[in-house]
Amino acid sequence: MKFVDEVEIRVEAGDGGNGCVSFRKEKFIEYGGPNGGDGGDGGDVYLMADEGLNTLIDYRFERFHRAKRGQNGQPQNCTGKGSEDLVLKVPVGTRAVDQDTGEQIGDLTYKGQKMLVAKGGWHGLGNLRFKSSTNRSPRQRTDGTPGEIRSLKLELLLLADVGLLGLPNAGKSTLIRSVSAATPKVADYPFTTLVPNLGVVRLDTQRSFVIADIPGIIEGAADGAGLGTQFLKHLERCRILLHVIDIMPVDGSDPLENAKVIISELEQHNEKLAGKPRWVVFNKLDLVLEEEAKEITDAIIAGLDWKGEVHSISAFNRSGTKELTQKVMTFIEELPPEEEEVIDGKTVEFKWDTYHEETIAAHSQDDDLDDDDWDEDDYDVEVEYRQ
């Protein structure tokens, strides 16, 4: 199945049903009181995380989604039926952004999590709601409000503990093949990896972590060059990044300059991503003598003024990979639990959150009644008119 990690959709919540104007009609009661019921609420639109999905491709072909309208109110004080909510299933790791405002609505990071993205319209009020001591036969009612409409951008961000980054042909795919059961394509030409790959590294039955491999990054990626820039977002949720450096590039380029390119592009793309824990992993040590390899790696470390963790491996023959994965596992286990990200420190507000309060308050002011004139039992009073 084709991997699609970004789509644009339009969601429309259901409109609220209108209130009803109706009066009680019975034998021997010529002028019955009001009995018009309220309408039903319109359906909300939710996104729900489904672990059985791993791509957003379905929404590439079906972009418009609308919840049903609430029923209108009925006589005899019958409330209209509220509409069912519309639930759209998306992969775990999906982020929703409002395209019109740029507001990030939220992330779906675990199975079964639901997120409201469009609020259904409120129900209209029937004329029974407007009965008072001074208005025994109200003909007022209110219409249901329209459902909220949003244009959304859905982004799928892979959930992984470890992310691999580096230039094309640095050996990232070979590394993920050597430490996990993942089988990404490996070849001797650039951009063999065209989509992100995930692999599970199991040290024993109780200890494991997920590792992500994205397409290689090239110079100018932050400005749109190559494939890496559109997939860098998949590393945002990783807890640690492994910068894979090819010490013997096939094109004869300088590995130090190649490493500087990656660091520069990372900083330009996202400060948060650039600030994540990052280890340097020198790869392809099997291509040179041990003394020559040490000379090359020492020069790169000095050129980068690198003070962090350094590992030297050969992903092809799996030399040094076991020690690397063990240290990564220990590092992840010692990290403090991740705190749930709060978006802008406030809750997303929807269009009709205060509709009922404002509507009822407005009609209360119109009645202009004193407390002494009002009796809650008036709602149940049956009035008989005689000529």
From Swiss-Prot:
Mg(2+) binds at S173, T193. It comes from Colwellia psychrerythraea (strain 34H / ATCC BAA-681) (Vibrio psychroerythus). It comes from the Bacteria. An essential GTPase which binds GTP, GDP and possibly (p)ppGpp with moderate affinity, with high nucleotide exchange rates and a fairly low GTP hydrolysis rate. Plays a role in control of the cell cycle, stress response, ribosome biogenesis and in those bacteria that undergo differentiation, in morphogenesis control. PROSITE patterns: G_OBG, GTP1_OBG, OBG. The lineage of its organism: Bacteria, Pseudomonadati, Pseudomonadota, Gammaproteobacteria, Alteromonadales. Gene3D superfamilies: GTP1/OBG domain, P-loop containing nucleotide triphosphate hydrolases. Residues 361-387 are annotated as: Disordered. The keyword Hydrolase applies. Its main location: cytoplasm. HAMAP family: GTPase_Obg. Monomer. This is GTPase Obg. GO terms for molecular function: GTP binding; GTPase activity; magnesium ion binding. Residues 367-387 have a biased composition (Acidic residues). Residues 160-333 form the OBG-type G domain. It is found in: Cytoplasm.
